Amino acid sequence: MAAAPVSSDIRPISHQSTNDKVFALVMPYVRGGARVVDVGAGEGYFSKMVGDRFAAETGRAPNTVLAACDLFPEFFRYDGIRCDPINADGSLPYRDGAFDVACSLEVIEHIKDQFAFTRELYRVVRPGGVAIVSTPNVLNLNSRVRYLHSGFTVLFDPLLMSSDDPRHTAGHINPVPYYYLAYQLRRAGFRSVTAHYDRFKTSARALLAAWGPFIGVAHGLFRRRLAVKKPDVVAENADMLRELNSVRMLTSRSVIAVATK
């Protein structure tokens, strides 16, 4: 059962459909008693979704299973838990293996050193736990067409050089296609990564009807050539390469990586 939108003045940092999908992925762990941390929690919209549902179902305080952290904890507004400050060097303020699940919704595209960020997620998750990381899907067809004619993917625009104020750029400084997100997570140490998606865009489906046959043929030729030149690369990346031109990847708004330690 999906959560209802948070009925408060706490603002989400990601689309409602992304919150709903990650909520659906997280709640089975929460119901099993898992410890969860919301990394880059913003004002606490997603934390409130999880915390309020947990409290309603169990009668227990949200802080028994849920934690949150952010670079700017002073803006956190959900009173069910506290928000811990992320350290100045970007490290998370938790011991190794402190959580069963680390969630990060639409944060990684704001991060300068994404490899350091995924290593921190790996560090704070226990063996057998998961990291759930969402980001705008720059591989959907809307984004690919926009990049073709403008040089910029969807949700990523030219940046104001004279200001570091994230209000001028929405903080989107580092687009990461799914392959490179999965690569970073695997390099951090996670043993497997799977792709999930939030909502599928009608406009991207229309583009798929027109471009689908061409993409299928061209990608098949690319894979064949890669298999001849670099068979070891194909073997190591087979699952990620298969996902890149799936119908879901070509049509979804955001992509969500679930990485298992």
Please place each PLM-identified region on the residue numbering:
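Conserved class I S-adenosyl-L-methionine
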Residues: 1-30
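Flexible, charged surface loops at secondary-structure boundaries
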Residues: 29-32, 251
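Conserved SAM-binding loop
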Residues: 23-27, 34-146, 177, 182, ...
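S-adenosyl-L-methionine-dependent methyltransferase catalytic module, highlighting the catalytic core
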Residues: 7-17, 45, 49, 85, ...
